[in-house]
Amino acid sequence: MKKWLFLAFAAAFSLSVQAQELTENKEYVVVEGQQRSAQPEVIEFFSFYCPHCYSFEAQYHIPQKIAESLPEGTSFKQYHVDFLGPQSENLTRAWALALAINAEEKVKIPLFKAAQTNALKSMDDIRQIFIDNGVSAEQFDGGINSFAVNGLVTKQQNLVKKYQVRGVPDFYVNGKYRVNMEGLAHDENHFIDEYVQTVKGLLQK
């Protein structure tokens, strides 16, 4: 019993120390002119054309690890930027559709693979990826220009402007803090852990 209490205390103390040890302009930067969000949230901005975003998703699984570690009641959203690649605007719209119909996990990796190999020449190519991965043609055609999808396209674009996103992947916590990738460990294993712990620590600030 004493050992269990000690371990529980040590774990809680460790989390507290992690939050306190985060240093502004090292592990994170404060986003100028932004207020803390009303509800706890983590937002990732990414592009299907971005090789680092692809590595984050498919190799290092950083978004998944962050999502799995978040406290109850914390939202995690991934939003696409449309300033990279020839089909980036179409991909932002397609991602909005995926969000609207809860098809993110069906199409995310296939879209990454296609964009990384420059296989996307038009919205028709994107449409085929959706169909090949479990979204019906009727769902795609009926939703891609719908009111809900138009709203999500605008939301993604407005948030990119709001946070002045210039590069990806880019993570924002509670609308006020941005994870500073350059300030984290450079070796792979420590980098992944530090990234996740930085997000968790910023949620406590």
Region locations from a protein language model:
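Sec-dependent N-terminal signal peptides
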Residues: 4-13
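Structural alpha/beta surface segment adjacent to cysteine/selenocysteine redox centers
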Residues: 48-127, 198
